[in-house]
């Protein structure tokens, strides 16, 4: 991996004892066909709502929600994205330190990938999932308490607010994952409301395209040709045709719960499961065993430009790297805690990960480095 990088972190807990980790598992399917979107809209910036509430205190039924914030929480576990040219890394700073009066803002922060220094704060008060458009100019941003998705330019200027997913009362982001197609024409959003929505994204146009009904979708990955979407959900792993909305496959050979999916550049789909802890390689109609994860609870997977696979766990800080050319696996230098979302740099040289307490982490040829905290 290349030679330079930088440092950051966050976590939220509930006095009600709700586990966020329990909300982030799965890979699956529901119906055998999609439905044309009859609701949902791309609202232009001039009509969009103001910033989401900083710390909502009531559910829709009027009951109260108590949230405990911790000053050592910095980065959203799923809020990480690398720019298509590899020059920048974005992550979402959690609201914890803002609520506690320790920071003046929270939301999307952008770092220089080579130095690990903060170059921009979007001050958008969003701390959920994050995706970077392959054209490099747009970011799609979720929020911990808001079901609407914001699409902004890289300076933080709001372009559209995507509405259609339902609000979820329980703690944990209602938007579980966001992914742009490789050609940049679609944005997929997975929600805990039991749907995956597809949004058309072309130049200066945004429109709702389709909604797929899927039981508890958690992870998304587009195929290299942008024609298919793999969905990790509570009851299994499925592959959907994005043009017809038809479910093409429900992978019965992959036991559920499936906790992660990622397409490689050659079209091979990698799926990981937590019970038992295993990985699978899906090549067309063939499903074969993949590299053995480092622990029994693999939770995230990322595939590089040259097909190398990184797998992390929810219960152990180890990150395993597997090279398909040599069929050899190794452990990356151990991070200080378990990591969230992982992404490779476009050239496949660096691996980035979100750490709630320690910020953005970067594995390079000479070891593990931390970006500056936001």
Spans of features found by a protein language model:
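N-terminal secretory signal peptides that target proteins for export/translocation
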Residues: 1-7
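WD40-repeat beta-propeller superdomains and closely related acidic/aromatic-rich repeat-like regions
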Residues: 3, 17, 21-374
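N-terminal export leaders
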Residues: 10-16
């Amino acid at each position: 991996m290349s030679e330079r990088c930088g440092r950051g972190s966050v976590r939220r807990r509930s006095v009600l004892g709700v586990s966020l980790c329990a909300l982030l598992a799965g890979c699956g399917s529901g119906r055998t066909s999609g439905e044309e979107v009859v609701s949902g809209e791309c609202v232009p910036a001039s009509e969009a709502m103001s910033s989401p509430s900083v710390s909502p205190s009531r559910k829709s039924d009027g009951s109260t929600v108590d949230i405990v914030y911790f000053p050592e929480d910095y980065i959203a576990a799923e809020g990480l994205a690398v720019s298509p040219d590899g020059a920048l890394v974005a992550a979402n700073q959690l609201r914890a330190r803002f609520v506690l009066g320790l920071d003046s803002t929270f939301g999307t922060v952008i770092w220089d990938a080579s130095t690990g220094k903060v170059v921009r704060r979007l001050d958008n008060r969003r701390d959920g999932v994050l995706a970077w458009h392959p054209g490099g100019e747009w970011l799609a941003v979720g929020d911990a308490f808001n079901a609407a998705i914001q699409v902004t330019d890289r300076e933080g200027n709001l372009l559209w607010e995507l509405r259609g997913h339902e609000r979820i009362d329980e703690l944990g982001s209602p938007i579980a994952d966001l992914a742009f197609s490789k050609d940049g024409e679609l944005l997929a959003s997975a929600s805990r409301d039991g749907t995956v929505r597809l949004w058309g994204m072309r130049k200066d146009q945004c429109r709702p395209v389709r909604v797929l009904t899927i039981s508890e979708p958690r992870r998304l990955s587009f195929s290299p040709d942008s024609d298919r979407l793999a969905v990790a959900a509570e009851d299994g792993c499925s592959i959907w045709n994005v043009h017809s909305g038809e479910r093409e496959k429900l992978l019965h050979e992959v036991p559920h719960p499936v906790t992660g999916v990622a397409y490689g550049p050659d079209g091979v789909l990698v799926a990981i499961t937590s019970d038992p802890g295993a990985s699978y390689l899906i090549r067309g109609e063939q499903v074969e065993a993949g590299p053995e994860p480092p622990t029994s609870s693999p939770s995230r997977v990322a595939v590089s430009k040259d097909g190398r696979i990184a797998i992390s766990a929810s219960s152990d800080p180890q990150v395993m790297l597997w090279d398909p050319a040599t069929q050899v696996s190794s452990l990356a230098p151990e991070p200080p805690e378990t990591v969230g979302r992982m992404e490779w740099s476009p050239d496949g040289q660096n691996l980035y990960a979100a750490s709630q307490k320690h910020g953005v982490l970067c594995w390079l040829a000479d070891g593990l480095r931390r970006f500056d905290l936001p």
